[in-house]
From Swiss-Prot:
UniProt xrefs under Gene3D superfamilies: 1.10.1040.50, 2-enoyl-CoA Hydratase, Chain A, domain 1, NAD(P)-binding Rossmann-like Domain
Stated family: In the N-terminal section; belongs to the enoyl-CoA hydratase/isomerase family.
Catalytic activity: a (3S)-3-hydroxyacyl-CoA + NAD(+) = a 3-oxoacyl-CoA + NADH + H(+); a (3S)-3-hydroxyacyl-CoA = a (2E)-enoyl-CoA + H2O; a 4-saturated-(3S)-3-hydroxyacyl-CoA = a (3E)-enoyl-CoA + H2O; (3S)-3-hydroxybutanoyl-CoA = (3R)-3-hydroxybutanoyl-CoA
Single GO BP term: fatty acid beta-oxidation
Pfam families named in the record: 3HCDH, 3HCDH_N, ECH_1
UniProt-listed HAMAP family: FadB
Annotated spans, Disordered: 708-729
Species the sequence originates in: Salmonella agona (strain SL483)
Pathway field: Lipid metabolism; fatty acid beta-oxidation
Name of the protein in its database record: Fatty acid oxidation complex subunit alpha
Site description Important for catalytic activity, residues in chain: 119, 139
Residues reported in the UniProt entry to bind substrate: 296, 500, 660
Amino acid sequence: MLYKGDTLYLDWLEDGIAELVFDAPGSVNKLDTATVASLGQALEVLEKQHDLKGLLLRSNKAAFIVGADITEFLSLFLVPEEQLSQWLHFANSVFNRLEDLPVPTLAAVNGYALGGGCECVLATDYRLATPDLRIGLPETKLGIMPGFGGSVRLPRMLGADSALEIIAAGKDVGAEHALKIGLVDGVVKQEKLIEGAIAVLRQAITGDLDWRAKRQPKLEPLKLSKIEAAMSFTIAKGMVAQTAGKHYPAPMTAVKTIEAAARFGREEALNLENKSFVPLAHTNEARALVGIFLNDQYVKGKAKKLTKDIETPKQAAVLGAGIMGGGIAYQSAWKGVPVIMKDINDKSLNLGMTEAAKLLNKQLERGKIGGLKLAGVISTIHPTLDYAGFDRVDVVVEAVVENPKVKKAVLAETEQKVRPETVLASNTSTIPIGELASALERPENFCGMHFFNPVHRMPLVEIIRGEKSSDETIAKVVAWASKMGKTPIVVNDCPGFFVNRVLFPYFAGFSQLLRDGADFRKVDKVMEKQFGWPMGPAYLLDVVGIDTAHHAQAVMAAGFPQRMQKEYRDAIDALFDASRFGQKNGLGFWRYKEDSKGKPKKEEDAAVDDLLASVSQPKRDFSDDEIIARMMIPMINEVVRCLEEGIIASPAEADMALVYGLGFPPFHGGAFRWLDTQGSAKYLDMAQQYQHLGPLYEVPEGLRDKARHNEPYYPPVEPARPVGSLKTA
């Protein structure tokens, strides 16, 4: 053994070839600060070996290196800019030493090589991969850019266009694509990987392969003419501006850095990368996006822990077909859980099957599946008008009309047709689970399972624990949701649960703005362009359905009369009374017509202004800040109340439910991350300016207490240790 660290070791392999093996404790390798330091120490040993002829890098895990240790990021991002820059210089000196070894080097890459793992293998001369490879640079999705030379080496290896596509979009690619663009030099089966790697190294050692020529382009300026450079970077900047926008600075910074570094060799280019990375790491956007990544890991880890002793359901059923039922049936079947889809009439069943078939055909058109796979999946969805087969069902989700009487009747009837241990769930969006459970003989086997529309796209499923729901019931439904590829978050029961409970105060803020003379078009524009929502409130109401919102608004008002009971007729009432239900019937705040792809396209409709005039004061202008404050304060206050009341268990789960269920702008990180970024005291000062607007604008006492003590909702993060300590970690 030449060297042994905590996460990697160095040893002779055979005949002058050494192997550097990443083998961290635990299930995966991460390129954390300690591993970077250890890699430097291993290279120091290697540089003294006069008999060295070649170096093989490999992993002892199922994945090569999954990336940097994201859990270190928030503390690293708090290090002063100069110290962070120094540490990056140190880390890059390690990868430069790997790249500058006087012998050929090869990385044998299996599984994932992402972020820092990808940047590590870019420093070698050759790369062999297994068919399960996923390699790429996802840093821009975390609000930063590659910092270990990825923005320097990748363009010089692949050319500007392919590299920009990967870096700006934060993409990873599979083995076949990586081979096609030159990111890897060959793809071999796992059992042949080491044998193949040694064979390539031997060819390089004997001179049959020119490893020096392979290495040289990575050390030089990017080979692009002025015209080629202008075309590549102009197109890339245009696409990034269109897709990322002003709220996500990392992709544009990465493109501009690659452009600026194109005319320099490695050292100067790395300096430019460093100068771009450090300011990005100190942005609120980076902290928010890293926070989302960590919260996502926390939420999924919690679901995994909850279901560790639970068998995933083998047979499911959906009550109620149509678009929602068909979407749930598709998602279950697509992920491998057969499903019975029951309805009371053929028309609805046909609609549900058509929806499932349409979604499968889209997968076929995109090349994700073949005809046999499509036929196999669709055959596991069994439409029926009766309860045949329900005696073998493990879990049933009810998705009938949002009417408590109908839901109770359907659930009570179904309970008599299934085994005693079968779990029942309701896809209700607002009706309390306790109310629906009152119709059942076994309420302990019942809970809520709230999907979001469209089911196949929306990642969140709210799992609602009723007062009598058993732990096993919750675990079974969480297991099914996880199997469907969803992110389940368990919440406690109340009207609207978590997501809709906090959404309707937001809509109430919108209604009050319109009542006071705001133009809904400007409100939408501000909330989309300035705050960052994917849809403004008027457009969102049209998509949800004005009739749906009108009904849910009444349910919420009954559940929380002290805050959500209206004392005036609002815009939702006016549109509902005029049968303007939104996209579903082509008339809402906007008029809708289908475009060439059959998708609804919104158009101005002057008639709506006359309609809204009956429930509004004369039009007046509001500042962007005032619109944002009046829209967001009711939502934020209700989110805080949900945490204080135990409806949601943690800030992390609340923020992920908002991001995954409502599209809360990820660059804000969620409501609690947004609060922490602003500071509770600053938020309180803002909110108090609007408390005259009513109970929805009254800040909860717990938030006031946070402001008094200057406390964040997330645990405070300490800056990483000084750079000197990081080097020798």
